[in-house]
Structures are given as C-alpha cells and as structure tokens.
C-alpha cells in the first residue's frame, strides 16, 4: 500500500467530478452561498465538519490528486484501469474514495466499492483514515473485513479487506454482485490470493460488463498488468522529490556491523528524521534490536533519545505511523529506528522517515512439493523491492537511502520483479478454493504467472489423501465442508474428524492456537530461566497440542476471574505470554465454533483431561496430519521424516525439549528446512494408532524405509477388525466415506 496519505491531514471545498449528483443547491446565488456555509456530505446527509476541510487540504497535496480528473475519465470509459504510482503517492486512500463518488453518482445500481490489501494492518488503518477523510462513521459508510473480524454493515459503501477475504467471498458469491467497483491494491506484492483474484476477475468481468476493476501497482509491474488485461489505460503518478542513494564501494563484510555503525552515525550527525532498517529475517531484527539497545544506553543525552521499534508484520498491532502532535509537544526530540523485513514494506506510514538502510537480502519461505516442507532461503531482494524502499523517502526533499550492497550487485544479482507467491507456496488451500468455485481445468485458468505443474499435482494428491476429492476429481462432501473453514485443509480435516471422535471443543482450541501468532513471547536475554519456569506450569505430558489447550484454558480462567483487562495483561506479562495472541486465538475459536453451528456439525461437551479424550484428540489430529509424522532414529532427538530423508529436532520451546523426554514417534504441525530444521508443535503418537488412521493408499505410496517397516509390523499386531475398518474408512469409495462421516 502507499501512504503519505496517512500522514497528511488541509484546502478549499472539494471540487467533485459528478456535481449534478452531489449538488444540494437550487442554483440561485443566495442558495449557493447558504449551501457553501453548510455543505452536506452526500454519503450520510450531514453537514461536513471542520476536520473534513482540514484533511481535504492534505489530500490535495498528495501526488495523486492532480490525476483525479484523468482517473475519473478513464473509469467512465473503461472497464479496467491500472493506477501506477510510488508507495507514497496516495493511491490506496484516494482512488477508493473517487470510486465511491462514482458509485454514488449512479445511485449504487451495480453495488459499492471494495478495496483489497495484502496485509490486515493496512486494511484496518486505511479504513480508519478514509472514514476520517470522508467524514463518516467507521463500520457504517466505510468499513473493513479481515480474517476473523468484520467491521461492516449491509449499508457499507466502501470496504477495505484483505485479499484472501474477497477470495473467500467468491465461494458464496462467485460473480461478486455486491460490488460495482473492485480495487486490487498492492498487486506488486504478488500475494497468492491477489494473483488468484487477478485471474478469476477476468472471467467475472466478462460475465458482468458493468463491473469496474482498478488495479493499483508499482511502476515496474505496470506494463505487464496492462497487457495482461488487454492493453488497458494506465494512470501514472510521479513523486516529486529525488532521493540520494548511497551504495557500497566494495564487497560486504559484516551487515550487522554496518547497520549498527550507520544507525549511530546518523543519530550523532544531528540530522533530524526517523530511520527504517530493512533486514533479512525476524531473527536479524531481534539481534539488531538487542545490539542497538545495548549500545544506545551509553549515548550522550545531548544527542537525543534513540527509540528502537521492531516491526513484525505478523502481529496485528504492528504499524509504523507518524507521532501524534500531542505526543510531540510532551517530549524532547526522539529519533525512532524501525527494524523490519521485506514484509514490512507496506507498513511504513510516516513522513518523518528521512533515512532508509537496506541490506538487500531477505529470507523467503519456498515450498518444496517433493518433500512437503518449506525451505528458508536467503536470497537478494528484487529491483522492484529496492525501488519501493527508496520510495519511502519520496516525500522528503533530503532523504537518503543507504544500500549495503554494490550498484553492480543491484543490477546483476537482483531480479527485476518480486517472485509471485504462487510459484513458491503450498497450493493445497488454493486448489481446494478453486475446486469450490468450480473452475474447470486448473491448467487453463489464466494466472499472470502459472504455478508449477508439480506443485499443482502435489496439492491435488494431498486433497485426495484427505478425502476432499471424489473419484472424478471433484470436491467430495468432506471437501465442501473443509472449504467452509478459513484454515489449512489438514486442520479443517482434523476438526471434521473431531466431530466423530467427540473432541470438537478441544480441537477448536488447538486450531485457534496454532492459527493465531505464537502465544509464547520472545524472551529477553537473561530472563530465559524465569520464562521456562513459568511455562512449565502449562506443560502436558501428551505433547505440545495439549500444552496449548492448557495455556488457553488458563487464559480463559484468568479472564473470568479478573476484575479488569489490565489484570489479564499483567497475568500474561508475568507468564511471558502474548496477550494479543491469546485474544486473537479467542476470536478465531469463536468464529470456528460459529461455523460448526452454522453447518450443524455435532458438538460434544468438553472432556479434556480424561485418558479417552486424549486418545480421541490424537485420532482427530492424525486424521488430518498423517502426512506429518517423524521418528526419533537414534534416541537422542534426531527425528527422521516419514515421507523423506530430512532429519529435524524438536523446537526448544517444545514440552519435550523442556522436560528432556523425547518420544519415539511424533505428529507435528510445522517443519521448515533451515539452519536448525526445527519441528514445531509436536505430540507423541504410537505406530499402532497411526496405522489405524492412515489411509492405506497413502501408506502404500510411502518410499521404502526402516520407519515404514516398523509401522508395517505394528499393523500386523492390530486386531483384524481394526485394520479392515480402517481400510473401509480410508477407501475412496463414496459409500465408505458415508459410513465414516457421521456428520453428513
């Protein structure tokens, strides 16, 4: 997204493009004067406040404002318009408002406006800002929809949403008939959901000639997008200030040392302005944070305070905004240093940034379909990302970009464009969605960048193993219900299985806790022992999934027994737990429970703590995660994946790592190939239980290994009726599916 617009709040009454629909005067001179004294807001019929005019002056200073007339002309005459502009030009806040004016001028006969964002933080903050600029109420005329939170009504004119939420809406409303204008923002981020929408909307536009599509992107992607939609018109917005770029003259030796040195050189120089540092990964953020805080504590007070802000995009509250004016008046000068990664490029919304330090590298998650695991790959950023980081300084006449790489590296080693997530991600959820919206022939869907055939085949294979597909390759009844949950298909399958195994309550808690950000806080140096002591009180001998239930239940007990929210926050702080993550888990769980009730799935009363309940939870987990099993091959915690020859260790925060008791077989929620190869969220399972639940056609396809032989021997010790029942359950025959699926 792109916001100098969020820093600016002042000019003459706005000259609207559709005066005939917005004018409230008779036309006589006296009436016009009266109308100007009390101009009415056409969106709610109330007089404009003084703040509206103050913000209007700021809007008119945005680079995009001078393109309003040409944009409105293009909108009237074309079905698709591409808006190309730098990340501080104002397109994310102004274009949706102009589209709302267009919809108002035609009396909303084709619907309202929806604008997608790649990040939920930007969707929320843009909605708040635009509601303020339009002088209307947030949640009424302007609202937002993000995962597990809907701040809209049926009367909402302009909605901001995350791209995945608009994608999910297509399951129930494939042609998006509620909207007259759809705006895809931040397309240059190439998120999976945005790329899917780009492809699907081509068909929607053919079916709905009255629908308008606006595509906002950075300049480097403009020509590709214009030709993708058939040489559509492009509105180009230029920023006004040049930026000084400083490259390294020689090879990079130590990026951490260079970053730390630059931060303090800038601070001691006396030049005003905040600093943004782009690092490769979150671990680098933590390391840099500690080093800067440690060295900053020894600064001379005369140079001013240095406030270090780690910006983690996964956290809901992470957003870097301008300092409030009242805050400025109450404090001495402070220079803020924001530490972030490439994921934070869209989250910097402050015109006070005067310096950007760019290491030129990022650690990306790249999915390997052959081993069904993500690899963390350190690689150069793209030229388009480097340009976006430069654009953060576009509003500053004296901004400086320090590139900790050579100019030759930028031209030869950096790719022109950021890789599409579709070419690097696990596509199982996407394929489930495409099947749900009944897109015939995935290979023929017109994606801007086609996904790898191997990734598509692996996704289809996994859905088949999960019983989400029938014999014809269409969605089974299981698959249709799985697609109702905004979760990974494996997690959705585990929830469905829990309906049969009478442990829905516990499974919903597990699903919410693994979907929300980690509830365990990053522990500062020196406090590790105290944190582990606190966390030991939550440990469960059956594994990490059960430990998460203990944490959630303890949080719920604290909420019920606390006098106020502050007491809950203090409890979380004392236990080294993230209060915001636990609140998010609570919200997610409530929505999942609502889905269970809406589609009338059976819901058993909680029975957590009993031996039978523990076994049932593991059965439900195995029903979805039978492809994520590992065995300790040497008794020392070296776990070999069942599906391939990768060796991993349990994460240090695992209950087994803390108690030093390593089970032989574990089911795990997450594994990434990286320096440490950690398995995250693991629980012990037995070979016998695994063989009861695993689909036989999946097991037969496993490569030969010692682990497979051990499992085969375990199956030989099972009662014959158990094995036969399992084969019936896991067979792809529709009749067998109906026998097991008591929820149908």
UniProtKB/Swiss-Prot annotation:
Signal peptide positions (record): none
Keywords for the protein's UniProt record, in alphabetical order: Acetylation, ATP-binding, Helicase, Hydrolase, Mitochondrion, Nucleotide-binding, Nucleus
Annotated ranges, domain Helicase ATP-binding: 72-270
Span list, region Disordered: 1-28
SMART domains on file: HA2
Alphabetized CDD domains for the sequence: DEXHc_DHX32, SF2_C_RHA
Compartments where located: Nucleus; Mitochondrion
Short motif DEAH box, span: 185-188
Family annotation (Pfam families): HA2_C (PF21010), HA2_N (PF04408), OB_NTP_bind (PF07717)
Annotated Helicase C-terminal domain residues: 258-438
Reaction equation(s) it catalyzes: ATP + H2O = ADP + phosphate + H(+)
Domain of life from the UniProt record: Eukaryota
EC number: 3.6.4.13
Name this polypeptide is given: Putative pre-mRNA-splicing factor ATP-dependent RNA helicase DHX32
């Amino acid at each position: 997204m792109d916001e100098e617009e969020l820093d600016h709040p002042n000019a003459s009454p706005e000259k609207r493009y559709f005066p005939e629909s917005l004018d409230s005067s008779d036309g006589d001179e006296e009436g016009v004067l009266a109308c100007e004294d009390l101009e009415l807001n056409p969106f709610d019929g109330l007089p404009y406040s003084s703040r509206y005019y103050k913000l209007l002056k700021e809007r008119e200073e945005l680079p995009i404002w001078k393109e309003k007339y040409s944009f409105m002309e293009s909108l009237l005459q074309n079905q698709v318009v591409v808006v190309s502009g730098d990340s501080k030009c104002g397109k994310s806040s102004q274009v949706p408002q102009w589209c709302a004016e267009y919809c108002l001028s035609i009396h909303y006969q084709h619907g309202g406006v929806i604008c997608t964002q790649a990040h939920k933080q930007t969707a929320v903050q843009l909605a708040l800002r635009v509601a303020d600029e339009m002088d209307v109420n947030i949640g009424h005329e302007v609202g937002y929809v993000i995962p597990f939170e809907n701040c809209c009504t049926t009367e909402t004119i302009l909605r901001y949403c995350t791209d995945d939420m608009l994608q999910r809406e297509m399951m129930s409303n494939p042609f998006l008939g509620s909207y007259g204008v759809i705006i895809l923002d931040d397309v240059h981020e190439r998120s999976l959901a945005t790329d899917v929408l780009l492809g699907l909307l081509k068909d929607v536009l053919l079916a709905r000639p009255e629908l308008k599509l606006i595509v906002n992107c950075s300049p480097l992607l403009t020509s590709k997008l214009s030709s993708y939609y058939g040489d559509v018109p492009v509105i180009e917005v230029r920023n006004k200030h040049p930026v000084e770029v400083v490259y390294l003259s020689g090879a990079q030796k130590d990026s951490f040392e260079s970053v730390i040195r630059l931060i303090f050189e800038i601070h001691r120089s006396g030049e005003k302005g905040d600093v943004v540092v782009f690092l490769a990964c979150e671990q680098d953020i933590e390391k840099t944070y500690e080093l800067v805080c440690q060295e900053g504590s020894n600064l001379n007070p005369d140079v001013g305070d240095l406030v270090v802000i780690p910006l983690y995009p996964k956290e809901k509250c992470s957003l870097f905004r301008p300092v409030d004016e009242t805050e400025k008046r109450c404090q001495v000068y402070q220079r803020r240093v924001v530490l972030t990664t490439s994921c934070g490029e869209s989250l910097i919304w402050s015109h006070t940034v005067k310096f950007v330090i760019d290491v030129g590298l990022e650690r990306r998650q790249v999915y390997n379909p052959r081993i069904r695991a993500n690899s963390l790959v350190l690689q150069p950023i793209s030229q388009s990302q480097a340009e976006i980081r430069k654009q953060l300084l576009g509003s500053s006449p004296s901004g400086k970009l320090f590139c900790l790489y050579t100019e030759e590296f930028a031209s030869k080693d950096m790719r022109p464009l950021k890789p599409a997530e579709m070419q690097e991600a696990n596509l199982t959820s996407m394929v489930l969605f495409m099947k749900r919206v009944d897109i015939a022939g995935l290979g023929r869907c017109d994606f801007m960048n086609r996904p790898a055939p191997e990734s598509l085949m692996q996704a289809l294979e996994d859905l088949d193993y999960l019983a989400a597909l029938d014999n014809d390759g269409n969605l089974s009844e299981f698959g249709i219900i799985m697609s109702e949950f905004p979760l990974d298909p494996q997690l959705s399958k585990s929830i469905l299985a829990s309906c049969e195994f009478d442990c829905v309550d516990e499974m919903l808690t597990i699903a919410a806790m693994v979907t929300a950000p980690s509830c365990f806080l990053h522990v500062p140096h020196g406090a590790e022992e105290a944190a582990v002591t606190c966390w030991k009180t939550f440990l469960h001998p059956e594994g990490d999934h059960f430990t998460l239930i203990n944490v959630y239940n303890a949080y719920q007990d604290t909420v019920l027994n606390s006098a106020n929210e502050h007491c809950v926050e203090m409890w979380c702080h004392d236990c080294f737990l993230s209060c915001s993550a636990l609140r998010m888990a609570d919200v997610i769980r409530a929505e999942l429970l609502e889905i269970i009730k809406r589609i009338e799935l059976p819901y058993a009363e909680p029975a957590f703590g009993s031996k039978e309940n523990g076994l049932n939870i593991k059965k439900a987990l195995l029903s979805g995660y039978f492809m994520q099993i590992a065995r300790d091959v040497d008794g020392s915690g070296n776990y070999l994946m069942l599906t391939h020859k990768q060796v991993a260790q349990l994460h240090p925060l695992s209950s087994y790592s803390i108690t030093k008791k390593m089970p032989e077989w574990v089911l795990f929620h997450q594994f990434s190939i990286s320096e440490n190869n950690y398995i995250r969220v693991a629980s012990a399972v037995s070979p016998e239980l695994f063989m009861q639940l695993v689909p036989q056609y999946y097991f037969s396809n496993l490569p030969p290994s010692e682990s497979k032989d051990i499992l085969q021997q375990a199956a030989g010790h099972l009662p014959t009726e158990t094995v036969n029942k399992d084969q019936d359950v896991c067979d792809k025959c529709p009749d067998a599916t109906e026998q097991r699926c008591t929820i149908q």
